[in-house]
Amino acid sequence: MRFFKLRNFERFAIKEGIPDDALKDVVAQMESGQINANLGGLVYKQRLARQGEGKSGGYRVILFYRQGERVFFAFGFAKANMANISQKDLTILKEQAKVLMQQPEESLGIMLKNGIIIEI
């Protein structure tokens, strides 16, 4: 399994102090069957606790996930700042997930080199 962050998500994670290990824990929870919301098209929404707090008032992360293959952390937000994503945004995210999941390894290498994605 390879773990990636999109550039905008990386900025969000740094700003909020979210460590990479916490992101890997989110995926481990999903692999054990704890999926908060399957939004379709390989797009999932998972809750992520703030440091020292619970999940209910924490963060929501949108990720593109195919079990045993790849995960891309695409978007994150604090629940206090945003209730949910719009249908329009979800449509865009599904298309982005489709494109990223179909990329061959060579293309991922180029994206990594150019800073479009960051590997965890």
PLM features: residue spans?
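Charged, alpha-helix-enriched surfaces in structured cytosolic catalytic cores
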Residues: 4, 18, 57, 69, ...
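Arg/Lys-rich, positively charged N-terminal/basic patches that mediate binding to nucleic acids
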Residues: 1-18, 113-120
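Sequence/structural signature of beta-propeller domains
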Residues: 16-18, 22, 42-44, 95
